[in-house]
């Protein structure tokens, strides 16, 4: 299935049914009172998060979603039938924005989360509501109200704890295959990964985290070059970024330090908030370096890059260093969660001082 992470849809809620002016016409009651019923409610349109859906492809090709109108009221006090609501199922992680105003309508972050997109119109009133002591035969009734209508932008941002970024062929897909059950395509040519891949990394029976792999970045990505710029938004929700670098490129003309700096610059130009996220350096393919020179080459690279944060030397192909990396990630995420919980508890603690 083609991966689609953006779509624009037009939603039209149903109009409320009209009320009606009618009178009782029964044998032996020549002047019956008003009996016009109300119109039914128009159908509303909802969005619901569904963890079994992972693309917005259905909404790229079916753009208009219209709920039915409520039925009109009838005589003999019969109310019009309300229309059924429509529920649009979308992937967890979908952000919904009003195209006209730019206002965020919803952020679907939990399975079965349900949000109203367009409210159906209220049904009109029949003439039985207008009877009074001075007006026994009212002919007034009201029309049903129109339903809400809007153009909405749908944007999927995957929910992951950890995001991988790096140049094409840095070994990101091999890494996520090595430590999770995800099976992205792996090959010896650039841009093998064409869309985000998610993998659940299980550290032990009770602990796990979700990792996201996106297409590799190239220089100029922030201005639209390559594929990765389209998918950088999928790293927005992550709590930790892993900058994966091919420390042993087969092409001697490639400078890993230059490429690593280029990635950091693209990240900074794309989104300052994303650039400021916690970020670790992962030097991949150390198995291709001479064993007696690995440590020296890695240290030289870190000095040249002026890297101050955490770094790991691994081989995603052989698994060397991967276990240590996954445990370090899990510990970091657990500390982050504890700190967040403490902050919330401190914020919520009532002030008992006089």
From Swiss-Prot:
Gene3D superfamilies membership: GTP1/OBG domain, P-loop containing nucleotide triphosphate hydrolases
All copies of domain OBG-type G, residue ranges: 160-334
GO cellular component, one term: cytoplasm
InterPro entries: G_OBG (IPR031167), GTP-bd (IPR006073), GTP-bd_Obg/CgtA (IPR014100), GTP1-OBG_CS (IPR006074), GTP1_OBG_dom (IPR006169), GTP1_OBG_dom_sf (IPR036726), OBG_GTPase (IPR045086), P-loop_NTPase (IPR027417)
Keyword entries, A-Z: Cytoplasm, GTP-binding, Hydrolase, Magnesium, Metal-binding, Nucleotide-binding
Molecular function GO terms recorded: GTP binding; GTPase activity; magnesium ion binding
Ligand binding (Mg(2+)): 173, 193
Subcellular location, record wording: Cytoplasm
Function description: An essential GTPase which binds GTP, GDP and possibly (p)ppGpp with moderate affinity, with high nucleotide exchange rates and a fairly low GTP hydrolysis rate. Plays a role in control of the cell cycle, stress response, ribosome biogenesis and in those bacteria that undergo differentiation, in morphogenesis control.
Similarity remark: Belongs to the TRAFAC class OBG-HflX-like GTPase superfamily. OBG GTPase family.
HAMAP family from the UniProt entry: GTPase_Obg
Protein name: GTPase Obg
Species lineage: Bacteria, Pseudomonadati, Pseudomonadota, Betaproteobacteria, Nitrosomonadales
């Amino acid at each position: 299935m083609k991966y689609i992470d953006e779509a624009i849809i037009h939603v039209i809620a149903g109009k409320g049914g009209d009320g009606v002016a009618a009178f009782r016409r029964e044998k032996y009651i020549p002047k019956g009172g008003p009996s016009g019923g109300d119109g039914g409610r128009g159908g509303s349109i909802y969005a619901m998060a569904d963890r079994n859906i992972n693309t917005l492809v259905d909404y790229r090709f079916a753009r208009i979603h219209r709920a039915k109108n409520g039925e009109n009221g009838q005589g003999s006090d019969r109310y019009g039938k309300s229309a059924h609501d429509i529920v649009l199922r979308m992937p967890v992680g979908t952000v919904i924005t009003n195209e006209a105003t730019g206002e965020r309508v919803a952020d679907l972050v939990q399975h079965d989360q349900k949000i109203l997109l367009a409210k159906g119109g209220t049904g009109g009133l029949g003439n039985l509501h207008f009877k009074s002591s001075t007006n026994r035969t009212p002919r007034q009734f009201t029309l049903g109200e129109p339903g809400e209508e809007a153009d909405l932008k749908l944007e999927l941002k995957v929910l992951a704890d950890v995001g991988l970024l790096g140049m094409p062929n840095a070994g990101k897909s091999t890494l996520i295959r090595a430590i999770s059950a995800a099976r992205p395509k792996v090959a010896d040519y650039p841009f093998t990964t064409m869309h985000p891949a998610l993998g659940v990394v299980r550290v032990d029976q009770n602990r796990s985290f979700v990792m996201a792999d996106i297409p590799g970045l190239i220089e100029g990505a922030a201005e639209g070059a390559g594929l990765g710029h389209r998918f950088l938004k999928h790293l927005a929700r992550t709590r930790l970024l892993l900058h994966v670098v091919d420390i042993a490129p087969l092409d001697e003309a490639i400078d890993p330090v230059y490429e690593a700096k280029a990635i950091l610059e693209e990240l900074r130009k794309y989104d300052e908030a994303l650039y400021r996220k916690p970020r670790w350096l992962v030097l991949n393919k150390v198995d291709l370096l001479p064993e007696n020179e690995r440590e020296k080459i890695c240290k030289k690279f870190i000095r040249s890059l002026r890297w101050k944060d955490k770094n790991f030397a691994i081989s995603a192909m052989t698994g060397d260093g991967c276990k240590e990396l996954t445990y370090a990630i899990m510990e970091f995420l657990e500390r982050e969660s504890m700190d967040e919980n403490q902050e919330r508890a401190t914020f919520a603690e009532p002030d008992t001082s006089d």
